[in-house]
């Protein structure tokens, strides 16, 4: 059986890079438009895949492995920027996870923790990326402040306080209603929002509280040609 070649992708020298310091705690978010040359080939690769699987973690949808050529493009383009913005050098990154991702979980099927902004890890030396391979009509990503604690990020020193505050809300019957958060609520304030745009990359610390902008009326299509397709990447210390 013939093996399809991996998509050819590389950093776009004309990419537009912006670094924002969001919220009162001024956590960095990097937004890169027109990130890669060959992004269309990535979308075609995802559409051709038959291996999207139900996610076993808290991602609300389906995932499939991104190609090795994508990882190589990240390796070739981002280390210098990451060190300048986040103070993290390549030797601190022990593993990288890159996955095609599709939001497919309907609001009524969400676990309560999927209805609120989340952190990906408690290590500020770990980073997350979302690379949109869809348009703005499918929703971007927002960053949030937890009102009771004032936290906009949750590191190891804040974890117990944050989880304790959420537990207190649950005991008091203040659970979020079924559905995705997409703006201000009694518990959380939106402090920054980025639209999806084809070939836009967002890069931020795993500790930052964030959530996808999944609006009412969203079509939870499982076809990557039609759904909210992205590549989600984690740069991890272990």
Residue ranges and their predicted role:
Residues 1-238:
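Fe(II)/2-oxoglutarate oxygenase catalytic core
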